[in-house]
From Swiss-Prot:
It comes from the Bacteria. GO terms for molecular function: unfolded protein binding. Its main location: cytoplasm. Belongs to the SecB family. The gene is secB. Homotetramer, a dimer of dimers. One homotetramer interacts with 1 SecA dimer. InterPro entries: SecB, SecB-like_sf. Keywords: Chaperone, Cytoplasm, Protein transport, Translocation, Transport. This is Protein-export protein SecB. One of its GO terms (biological process) is protein folding. The keyword Protein transport applies. GO terms for cellular component: cytoplasm. It is found in: Cytoplasm. One of the proteins required for the normal export of preproteins out of the cell cytoplasm. It is a molecular chaperone that binds to a subset of precursor proteins, maintaining them in a translocation-competent state. It also specifically binds to its receptor SecA.
Length: 170
């Protein structure tokens, strides 16, 4: 089924089986860790400040497959200096066969990022620890609420995640 979905053709048996949502591939698209002020930052007694940015992009690969990229940038500063910047883009290819556009939109905006998020959490934590800093655990994110907010914003535009190349922010 994987080759058929990635090549844009659903097998006749799949169509007869009804709607399908499949995980075709999960992979790291991009990863970066910088600690520009190490090792001096390890002795900084200032309270660290964290800034988290989250972004989701969706790209239609063909009629039955979509790439979803969940991007997280975590910036830690202490005493006005950057302690570290961790950037992760975790991606997945998802097969969506026999579903109406609204169901596809909901799955792309909620289920797919929920599937990718544990991978992002682990990678961010591992990067930060490998950089010599205490572990940081991303807290759960309510992608359903983010999707509902995004949906309200898009209703006036008449767009959907499935129709767009990159879908923008989540």
């Amino acid at each position: 089924m994987s080759d058929e979905i990635l090549n844009g053709a659903a097998a006749p048996a799949d169509a007869a089986a009804g709607p399908a949502f499949t995980i075709e591939k999960i992979y790291v698209k991009d990863v970066s860790f910088e600690s520009p002020n190490a090792p001096a930052v390890f002795n900084d007694a200032n309270q660290p400040e964290l800034q988290l940015n989250l972004n989701q992009k969706v790209q239609r690969l063909n009629d039955n497959a979509f790439e979803v990229v969940l991007a997280v940038t975590l910036t830690c500063t202490a005493g006005g200096k950057t302690a570290y910047v961790a950037e992760v883009q975790q991606a997945g290819v998802f097969g969506l066969v026999g579903l109406d556009p609204q169901a596809i939109d909901v799955l792309l905006g909620t289920q797919c990022p929920n599937i990718l998020f544990p991978y992002v959490r682990t990678l961010v934590s591992d990067l930060i620890q490998a950089g010599g800093f205490p572990p940081f655990y991303l807290q759960p994110i309510n992608f359903e609420a983010l999707y509902a907010e995004t949906l309200r914003q898009r209703q006036n535009e008449g767009t959907s995640l499935a129709d767009s190349e990159p879908a923008g922010n989540a």
